[in-house]
Amino acid sequence: MKAFIWTLSVLFFLLMGIGHGRGRQFKIKKITQRRYPRATDGKEDAKKCSYTFLVPEQKITGPICVNTKGQDAGTIKDMITRMDLENLKDVLSKQKREIDVLQLVVDVDGNIVNEVKLLRKESRNMNSRVTQLYMQLLHEIIRKRDNSLELSQLENKILNVTTEMLKMATRYRELEVKYASLTDLVNNQSVMITLLEEQCLRIFSRQDPHVSPPLVQVVPQHIPNSHQYTPGLLGGNEIQRDPGYPRDLMPPPDLVTSPTKSPLKIPPVTFINEGPYKDCQHAKDAGHSVSGIYMIKPENSNGPMQLWCENSLDPGGWTVIQKRTDGSVNFFRNWENYKKGFGNIDGEYWLGLENIYLLSNQDNYKLLIELEDWSDKKVYAEYSSFRLEPESEFYRLRLGTYQGNAGDSMMWHNGKQFTTLDRDKDMYAGNCAHFHKGGWWYNACAHSNLNGVWYRGGHYRSKYQDGIFWAEYRGGSYSLRAVQMLIKPID
């Protein structure tokens, strides 16, 4: 670029110099012609005088001496042209030096311009960066304000919750005091009830010396050493209890001394399989082979019911109508409770006399009773047929023949009506449900009491043999660990 500028400058000044030189030559020629006109004739020149003039010229360092003698116009013309060229060269050299200086100035100015442009660009970048930092700072300030607001809200919530907790703690302490007073009151009432019962028994014993129910033998004639029947998962869904619970500790007084006045409804649960089916065998035939809670609707019932179907026992299809595993449910209840059913389906429960009646009368059913003692030994009793008569007959029990290895302690109750504390239908002068603390098909009174009190540890001490016992297995003074009653259609 510099070479190009230099070339253009040289050409420009050359053209100006040439034009200036030609103009000066033209002026000199005219002056010469005017001052020294050509001789038209040599003779005329010889006759005339000759003069020499000193003519000052601009930019000529010395005077020009024009001598007409011995020189012609061409020589003078050449001399003037060389002097002009020398002057032109000097001018061009000066202009070249000036151009070089200007070029340096231009280069310096160009660098300054570039630096200015860079500085402007950096300034714009810095302005953009400052703007970004300002926006970030603004967002940070806003966020901190929001955080401080949220923190204050959380502090208010914590204060409110703390206040509520203090109120709840105060209420809890008040309830504890009330509970302690009610517990003392209940205990006192229980003691008074026991004293009144003993007084009544003493008074009644004077009138009838045989008031106490007959006790079954403490130890049966034979205890089976082994069993050929493989029981199912007794207590497979039982509620876990504290392993440190004393083995000989009896259930709370309210589980022993007072019946429940209102039926305990079975809570809603998540069904394992859809239904309804008429019984568990029907559900198994439909392809459901997993043990669990099913929706069952017997043929003559008004609505479905929930119950436990046990399919782990070969060949499966068993309907569980009663189950005891851990004493978590009170079985000392009134007639209405035993009619409708109570307990937890996946734990201890009684299906209900009406439900058992509807199930057992839609087909021919058999009964299986599984027993487990506190040494983890399991035995069973099976009856070839099972059904209940309607409520008008107080759900009278009908059983078939016995087979099994537990001993037959149920046949003594065959043909008997169901008895509860408020509905006495047994063959005894007193109320067997009162003495055995449960509802059952009592005779006078019991060789089996599977709805009695759940005692921990097996052998228990009680005046009236009110534990869960099977007289032909372990006797009446041994409370079994787990029992369950199951029915299914006869093959």
UniProtKB/Swiss-Prot annotation:
GO terms for biological process: blood coagulation; cell surface receptor protein tyrosine kinase signaling pathway. Its main location: secreted. GO terms for molecular function: signaling receptor binding. The keyword Signal applies. Residues 1-23 form the signal peptide. Gene3D superfamilies: Gamma Fibrinogen, chain A, domain 1 (3.90.215.10). Residues 271-491 form the Fibrinogen C-terminal domain. Residues 80-168 form a coiled coil. It is found in: Secreted. Glycans are attached at residues 160, 188. Keywords: Coiled coil, Disulfide bond, Glycoprotein, Secreted, Signal. NCBIfam families: GGGWT_bact. This is Angiopoietin-related protein 1. It comes from Bos taurus (Bovine). The lineage of its organism: Eukaryota, Metazoa, Chordata, Craniata, Vertebrata. The gene is ANGPTL1.
